[in-house]
Amino acid sequence: VTGLFTEPTGDFGHNPEPLEKNLGDIKALMQKGGHDLAFVVDPDVDRLAMFCEDGTMYGEEYTLVTVADYILQHTPGNTVSNLSSTRALRDVTRMRGGEYSAAAVGEVNVVAKMKETRAVIGGEGNGGVIYPEAHYGRDALPSC
């Protein structure tokens, strides 16, 4: 395990948005080899981005889909994402035998729809994952 920018100094080493254009350091580290996967979070740790072993960023849009696929393999159930997210979550949910619901944009709307449908996971396409087993809020850490 290799950490970058892990000391809470108050100074951020780059623009804190977990977008590929801001993450050259982690991309370069991954391209050097020796690591299988990289997890990147924003300063308040409510969004997660991932990098593959070759330094390719696994887009934020697919973070929720990837985590949901794993969760649904172990805890079958329903999912929710906002209307501006990829259809991939719907497809994965159906493949795993659950029901997918779309919510209006905004964490509060996603959470309300999750409670209404008893979803086991939900979130937004910007890397925000909501895992009710932990709590009803976007949180990157349970996704890792």
Where are these regions (language model features)?
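Phosphate-binding chemistry for phosphorylated carbohydrates and sugar-nucleotides
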Residues: 1-143
